Amino acid sequence: MFAVIKTGGKQYRVAANDVITIEKLEGVAGDKIEFTEILMVGVGADATIGAPFVEGAVVSAEVVDQGRAKKVIAFKKRRRQNSKRSRGHRQHQTIVRILDIAAAGGKAKKASKKTEAAAEAAN
């Protein structure tokens, strides 16, 4: 089972036990969070697409770590002016593990051993 969630202005395709890096969310390691802005939920080729969100669908996740991305350097140089400026920026990020996906009105479904093995083989 997979879902497409929206968080931090971006969309992510997730399945149970996936570990993803997203824009910063409040919380410390071990906190449980829920994503309610679910754009699509599906099993295999069968999918439910929301308009804009799937009603009642919830994705549960756990915060693994809080961190920062690699530094992005913003460098400006003005030729022949002996002038340059260098700035760096590191975006705050949250690493989360997807625990389970609950479809609209249904119970939470966790990944079975077969689907986990198939996902590992595909990667």
From Swiss-Prot:
This is Large ribosomal subunit protein bL21. Pfam families: Ribosomal_L21p. Keywords: Ribonucleoprotein, Ribosomal protein, RNA-binding, rRNA-binding. The keyword Hydrolase does not apply. This protein binds to 23S rRNA in the presence of protein L20. Belongs to the bacterial ribosomal protein bL21 family. It comes from Rhizobium meliloti (strain 1021) (Ensifer meliloti). SUPFAM superfamilies: L21p-like (SSF141091). InterPro entries: bL21-like, bL21-like_sf, Ribosomal_bL21. GO terms for biological process: translation. One of its GO terms (cellular component) is cytoplasm. The keyword Endoplasmic reticulum does not apply. Part of the 50S ribosomal subunit. Contacts protein L20. GO terms for molecular function: rRNA binding; structural constituent of ribosome. It comes from the Bacteria. The gene is rplU.
